[in-house]
Regions:
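Short, charged, surface-exposed loops that flank catalytic or proteolytic processing sites
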Residues: 58-67, 237
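Amphipathic alpha-helical segments within well-ordered protein domains
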Residues: 54-55
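Accessory "access/gating" subregions that flank catalytic or transport cores
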Residues: 70-151
Protein backbone atom coordinates (compact mmCIF):
# COMPACT_ATOMS: atom_id res chain seq x y z
CA UNK A 1 0.00 0.00 0.00
CA UNK A 2 0.93 3.63 0.38
CA UNK A 3 2.36 3.38 3.92
CA UNK A 4 5.94 2.51 3.00
CA UNK A 5 6.41 5.06 0.18
CA UNK A 6 4.65 7.81 2.16
CA UNK A 7 6.82 7.16 5.22
CA UNK A 8 9.93 7.02 3.04
CA UNK A 9 9.14 10.42 1.56
CA UNK A 10 8.29 12.04 4.90
CA UNK A 11 11.64 11.12 6.49
CA UNK A 12 13.85 11.22 3.41
CA UNK A 13 15.93 14.19 4.62
CA UNK A 14 16.42 12.65 8.05
CA UNK A 15 18.43 14.73 10.56
CA UNK A 16 19.93 17.04 7.93
CA UNK A 17 19.30 20.72 7.38
CA UNK A 18 17.84 20.83 3.86
CA UNK A 19 16.09 24.16 3.16
CA UNK A 20 14.08 22.88 0.18
CA UNK A 21 13.46 19.56 -1.47
CA UNK A 22 10.77 17.77 -3.41
CA UNK A 23 10.14 14.05 -3.44
CA UNK A 24 7.79 11.96 -5.54
CA UNK A 25 6.86 8.34 -4.93
CA UNK A 26 5.12 5.79 -7.13
CA UNK A 27 3.27 2.65 -6.08
CA UNK A 28 3.46 -0.40 -8.33
CA UNK A 29 1.30 -3.49 -7.88
CA UNK A 30 3.26 -6.72 -8.06
CA UNK A 31 3.14 -10.28 -6.78
CA UNK A 32 6.92 -10.33 -6.44
CA UNK A 33 7.43 -7.84 -3.62
CA UNK A 34 11.05 -7.46 -2.60
CA UNK A 35 10.29 -6.30 0.94
CA UNK A 36 7.20 -5.88 3.07
CA UNK A 37 6.01 -3.86 6.05
CA UNK A 38 7.18 -5.41 9.30
CA UNK A 39 8.87 -2.89 11.58
CA UNK A 40 9.34 0.85 11.00
CA UNK A 41 7.95 0.96 7.45
CA UNK A 42 9.72 3.53 5.31
CA UNK A 43 12.47 4.15 7.83
CA UNK A 44 15.24 1.93 6.51
CA UNK A 45 14.23 2.71 2.91
CA UNK A 46 14.66 6.46 3.48
CA UNK A 47 17.90 5.94 5.42
CA UNK A 48 19.42 3.77 2.70
CA UNK A 49 18.59 6.24 -0.06
CA UNK A 50 19.78 9.30 1.87
CA UNK A 51 22.96 7.88 3.36
CA UNK A 52 24.10 6.32 0.09
CA UNK A 53 23.55 9.65 -1.67
CA UNK A 54 25.70 11.33 0.98
CA UNK A 55 28.48 8.78 0.49
CA UNK A 56 28.33 9.29 -3.27
CA UNK A 57 28.38 13.09 -2.86
CA UNK A 58 31.37 12.86 -0.51
CA UNK A 59 33.24 10.76 -3.07
CA UNK A 60 32.46 13.25 -5.86
CA UNK A 61 33.57 16.18 -3.68
CA UNK A 62 36.66 14.40 -2.43
CA UNK A 63 35.85 14.92 1.25
CA UNK A 64 35.38 12.57 4.17
CA UNK A 65 31.81 11.14 4.44
CA UNK A 66 31.70 12.01 8.14
CA UNK A 67 32.75 15.60 7.45
CA UNK A 68 29.96 16.01 4.91
CA UNK A 69 27.44 14.76 7.45
CA UNK A 70 28.69 17.06 10.21
CA UNK A 71 28.46 20.04 7.86
CA UNK A 72 24.79 19.35 7.17
CA UNK A 73 23.36 17.97 10.42
CA UNK A 74 20.68 20.02 12.17
CA UNK A 75 22.26 21.72 15.18
CA UNK A 76 20.88 21.63 18.76
CA UNK A 77 20.45 25.42 18.61
CA UNK A 78 17.96 24.97 15.75
CA UNK A 79 15.57 22.89 17.88
CA UNK A 80 12.63 22.68 17.59
CA UNK A 81 13.29 22.32 13.86
CA UNK A 82 10.42 22.53 11.39
CA UNK A 83 11.22 20.31 8.43
CA UNK A 84 8.12 21.47 6.59
CA UNK A 85 5.02 19.67 5.43
CA UNK A 86 6.47 16.25 4.73
CA UNK A 87 3.39 14.29 5.86
CA UNK A 88 -0.27 14.48 4.98
CA UNK A 89 -1.50 15.54 8.42
CA UNK A 90 0.84 18.46 9.07
CA UNK A 91 4.38 19.74 9.43
CA UNK A 92 7.22 17.55 10.68
CA UNK A 93 8.74 19.23 13.74
CA UNK A 94 11.83 17.70 15.35
CA UNK A 95 11.28 18.53 19.01
CA UNK A 96 14.76 18.01 20.45
CA UNK A 97 18.07 16.29 19.84
CA UNK A 98 21.83 16.65 19.53
CA UNK A 99 22.54 14.91 16.25
CA UNK A 100 26.26 15.88 15.97
CA UNK A 101 26.91 14.46 19.43
CA UNK A 102 25.31 11.16 18.48
CA UNK A 103 27.43 10.83 15.35
CA UNK A 104 30.58 11.77 17.26
CA UNK A 105 30.00 9.02 19.82
CA UNK A 106 29.37 6.41 17.11
CA UNK A 107 32.59 7.32 15.29
CA UNK A 108 34.56 7.14 18.53
CA UNK A 109 33.32 3.60 19.13
CA UNK A 110 34.96 2.27 15.95
CA UNK A 111 38.05 4.50 16.03
CA UNK A 112 37.01 6.30 12.87
CA UNK A 113 39.48 9.18 13.09
CA UNK A 114 42.41 6.84 13.75
CA UNK A 115 41.58 4.53 10.82
CA UNK A 116 43.12 5.59 7.51
CA UNK A 117 42.38 4.85 4.79
CA UNK A 118 38.69 4.07 5.30
CA UNK A 119 38.85 1.17 2.81
CA UNK A 120 41.73 -1.28 2.49
CA UNK A 121 42.78 -4.89 1.82
CA UNK A 122 44.58 -6.72 4.61
CA UNK A 123 47.40 -9.25 4.30
CA UNK A 124 44.93 -12.14 4.04
CA UNK A 125 43.11 -10.59 1.09
CA UNK A 126 40.04 -9.49 3.02
CA UNK A 127 38.40 -6.22 2.03
CA UNK A 128 37.73 -3.77 4.89
CA UNK A 129 35.45 -0.76 4.95
CA UNK A 130 33.92 1.71 7.40
CA UNK A 131 30.29 2.72 7.06
CA UNK A 132 28.27 5.37 8.89
CA UNK A 133 24.63 6.44 8.88
CA UNK A 134 22.33 8.67 10.92
CA UNK A 135 18.56 8.66 11.31
CA UNK A 136 15.52 10.16 12.98
CA UNK A 137 12.35 8.21 13.71
CA UNK A 138 8.92 9.58 14.51
CA UNK A 139 7.23 8.09 17.57
CA UNK A 140 4.37 8.88 19.92
CA UNK A 141 1.54 9.18 17.42
CA UNK A 142 -1.74 10.41 18.94
CA UNK A 143 -4.43 11.40 19.14
CA UNK A 144 -4.81 9.99 22.67
CA UNK A 145 -4.05 7.18 25.08
CA UNK A 146 -5.64 6.24 28.39
CA UNK A 147 -4.83 4.68 31.75
CA UNK A 148 -6.90 3.80 34.79
CA UNK A 149 -5.45 3.38 38.30
CA UNK A 150 -7.30 1.68 41.17
CA UNK A 151 -5.99 1.46 44.76
CA UNK A 152 -7.36 -1.33 46.98
CA UNK A 153 -7.87 -1.11 50.74
CA UNK A 154 -4.68 -3.15 51.17
CA UNK A 155 -2.68 -0.47 49.37
CA UNK A 156 -2.21 -2.45 46.17
CA UNK A 157 -1.99 -0.25 43.05
CA UNK A 158 -3.57 -1.70 39.90
CA UNK A 159 -2.90 0.05 36.58
CA UNK A 160 -5.10 -0.70 33.56
CA UNK A 161 -3.66 0.30 30.18
CA UNK A 162 -5.40 1.25 26.96
CA UNK A 163 -2.43 -0.13 25.05
CA UNK A 164 -1.72 -3.86 24.78
CA UNK A 165 1.72 -5.34 25.21
CA UNK A 166 3.13 -7.93 22.81
CA UNK A 167 6.61 -8.26 24.23
CA UNK A 168 7.46 -4.55 24.48
CA UNK A 169 7.92 -4.74 28.26
CA UNK A 170 5.08 -2.39 29.19
CA UNK A 171 4.61 -4.25 32.47
CA UNK A 172 8.01 -3.04 33.65
CA UNK A 173 8.03 0.38 32.00
CA UNK A 174 4.57 1.43 33.16
CA UNK A 175 5.16 0.10 36.67
CA UNK A 176 8.30 2.24 36.89
CA UNK A 177 6.47 5.32 35.62
CA UNK A 178 3.61 4.75 38.07
CA UNK A 179 5.93 4.18 41.02
CA UNK A 180 7.96 7.32 40.30
CA UNK A 181 5.00 9.56 39.47
CA UNK A 182 2.69 8.45 42.27
CA UNK A 183 5.34 7.97 44.94
CA UNK A 184 4.92 4.29 45.79
CA UNK A 185 7.23 1.25 45.81
CA UNK A 186 7.31 -0.48 42.43
CA UNK A 187 6.59 -3.88 43.97
CA UNK A 188 3.03 -2.89 44.91
CA UNK A 189 2.16 -1.89 41.33
CA UNK A 190 0.49 -4.43 39.02
CA UNK A 191 -0.07 -3.75 35.32
CA UNK A 192 -3.10 -5.02 33.39
CA UNK A 193 -3.81 -4.69 29.67
CA UNK A 194 -6.04 -6.04 26.94
CA UNK A 195 -9.35 -5.75 28.82
CA UNK A 196 -11.85 -3.14 27.65
CA UNK A 197 -14.07 -3.87 30.67
CA UNK A 198 -11.62 -1.87 32.77
CA UNK A 199 -10.69 0.85 30.28
CA UNK A 200 -12.77 0.89 27.08
CA UNK A 201 -10.74 3.22 24.87
CA UNK A 202 -7.16 3.05 23.66
CA UNK A 203 -5.16 4.02 20.61
CA UNK A 204 -3.24 0.78 20.15
CA UNK A 205 0.34 -0.42 20.26
CA UNK A 206 2.31 0.49 17.13
CA UNK A 207 4.86 2.97 15.85
CA UNK A 208 6.82 3.14 19.13
CA UNK A 209 3.95 5.08 20.73
CA UNK A 210 3.43 2.94 23.84
CA UNK A 211 5.80 4.62 26.27
CA UNK A 212 5.27 8.14 24.94
CA UNK A 213 1.47 8.07 24.89
CA UNK A 214 0.67 5.33 27.40
CA UNK A 215 3.41 6.44 29.76
CA UNK A 216 2.11 10.00 29.78
CA UNK A 217 -1.41 8.73 30.41
CA UNK A 218 -0.14 6.78 33.44
CA UNK A 219 1.79 9.83 34.65
CA UNK A 220 -1.27 12.06 34.28
CA UNK A 221 -3.44 9.57 36.15
CA UNK A 222 -0.84 9.41 38.93
CA UNK A 223 -0.82 13.20 39.29
CA UNK A 224 -4.61 13.24 39.56
CA UNK A 225 -4.58 10.39 42.06
CA UNK A 226 -1.90 12.03 44.19
CA UNK A 227 -4.03 15.17 44.45
CA UNK A 228 -6.94 13.02 45.62
CA UNK A 229 -4.75 11.23 48.16
CA UNK A 230 -3.51 14.50 49.66
CA UNK A 231 -7.04 15.91 49.69
CA UNK A 232 -8.42 12.90 51.57
CA UNK A 233 -5.51 12.85 54.01
CA UNK A 234 -5.66 16.58 54.73
CA UNK A 235 -9.40 16.43 55.40
CA UNK A 236 -8.97 13.50 57.79
CA UNK A 237 -5.97 15.08 59.56
CA UNK A 238 -7.60 18.54 59.64
CA UNK A 239 -4.78 20.33 57.85
CA UNK A 240 -3.97 21.76 54.43
CA UNK A 241 -2.73 19.53 51.57
CA UNK A 242 0.33 21.77 51.28
CA UNK A 243 1.39 20.66 54.77
CA UNK A 244 1.57 16.99 53.75
CA UNK A 245 3.83 14.89 51.55
CA UNK A 246 2.98 11.55 49.94
CA UNK A 247 5.99 9.36 49.25
CA UNK A 248 7.00 5.70 49.54
CA UNK A 249 3.28 4.92 49.70
CA UNK A 250 2.67 6.85 52.92
CA UNK A 251 1.60 10.30 54.14
CA UNK A 252 4.12 12.38 56.08
CA UNK A 253 4.02 15.85 57.52
CA UNK A 254 6.14 18.13 55.32
CA UNK A 255 9.66 18.37 56.69
CA UNK A 256 9.25 15.15 58.68
CA UNK A 257 9.59 12.64 55.84
CA UNK A 258 12.13 10.58 57.81
CA UNK A 259 9.81 10.33 60.80
CA UNK A 260 6.77 8.13 61.40
CA UNK A 261 4.08 8.06 58.72
CA UNK A 262 0.68 9.57 59.50
CA UNK A 263 -1.30 7.33 57.12
CA UNK A 264 -0.61 4.42 54.80
CA UNK A 265 -1.95 4.15 51.26
CA UNK A 266 -4.29 1.35 52.32
CA UNK A 267 -5.72 3.51 55.11
CA UNK A 268 -6.30 6.34 52.64
CA UNK A 269 -8.10 3.90 50.33
CA UNK A 270 -10.37 2.96 53.24
CA UNK A 271 -11.07 6.66 53.82
CA UNK A 272 -11.94 6.97 50.13
CA UNK A 273 -14.66 4.34 50.58
CA UNK A 274 -16.44 6.91 52.78
CA UNK A 275 -15.51 9.81 50.51
CA UNK A 276 -19.04 11.24 50.12
CA UNK A 277 -19.21 11.87 53.87
CA UNK A 278 -15.63 13.18 54.00
CA UNK A 279 -15.27 15.46 50.99
CA UNK A 280 -18.31 15.04 48.77
CA UNK A 281 -16.42 12.99 46.17
CA UNK A 282 -17.44 9.62 44.66
CA UNK A 283 -16.33 6.66 46.77
CA UNK A 284 -13.20 4.70 45.97
CA UNK A 285 -9.59 5.63 45.31
CA UNK A 286 -9.25 5.49 41.55
CA UNK A 287 -8.87 7.70 38.51
CA UNK A 288 -8.89 7.48 34.72
CA UNK A 289 -6.85 9.86 32.58
CA UNK A 290 -6.35 10.36 28.86
CA UNK A 291 -3.24 11.97 27.43
CA UNK A 292 -3.72 13.79 24.13
CA UNK A 293 -1.13 14.91 21.59
CA UNK A 294 -1.32 16.26 18.05
CA UNK A 295 2.46 16.22 17.52
CA UNK A 296 4.99 13.45 17.10
CA UNK A 297 8.20 13.12 19.05
CA UNK A 298 11.42 12.02 17.37
CA UNK A 299 14.14 9.63 18.46
CA UNK A 300 17.48 9.73 16.68
CA UNK A 301 20.78 7.92 16.45
CA UNK A 302 23.90 7.14 14.47
CA UNK A 303 25.32 3.80 13.40
CA UNK A 304 28.92 3.04 12.51
CA UNK A 305 30.33 -0.25 11.27
CA UNK A 306 33.68 -1.78 10.37
CA UNK A 307 33.04 -4.62 7.92
CA UNK A 308 35.54 -7.17 6.61
CA UNK A 309 34.69 -9.46 3.68
Amino acid sequence: GSLVPASTASLLMGPYNVPAYQCGVHCVMTNKTGVGTFRAPGRYESCFIRERLLDMAAADLGIDPAELRFKNLIQPSQMPYNAGRTRADGDTVFDSGNYPQGLTKALEQIGYEQTNPKRWIDDTGRYHGLGIATYVKNTGRGPYEGARIVVSDTGQVDVYLGITTMGQGHETTMAQICADSLGVPMDIVTIFHGNTDYIPFGGGTYGSRGTVMGGNAVHLACQNLQERILSLASTYLDTEPANLVFQRGEIFRKGEELGPALLSLGEIACLAADAPSIEGEPPGLETTAYFESDQLTFSYGSHAAHVAV
